[in-house]
């Protein structure tokens, strides 16, 4: 099991959050679970999303055209930077 730390800017946190919440079923179906969502101190539109699951599932989800469309609709301004890690 790995943890994935994704960062990206959004147009508006208030616009993004409901779409992220609505997409939980897709993350769950992909074998990923939510760990947490964080906003950068001093910049509420710069986000860190932490997920947990299988690295192959994460890669597949990130390549999904459905996710790309959801991110566009949610106002994501750039592709996420992803750090994948395993707890030591």
Where are these regions (language model features)?
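Absolute protein N-terminus
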Residues: 1-2, 88
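Short, well-ordered beta-strand segments in beta-rich or mixed alpha/beta enzyme
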Residues: 2-9, 36-64
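Short, flexible beta-strand-to-coil junctions
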Residues: 9-11, 88
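Short amphipathic alpha-helical segments
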Residues: 12-34, 66-71
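Glycine-rich beta-strand-turn "strand-cap" elements at beta-sheet edges
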Residues: 30-47, 70-88
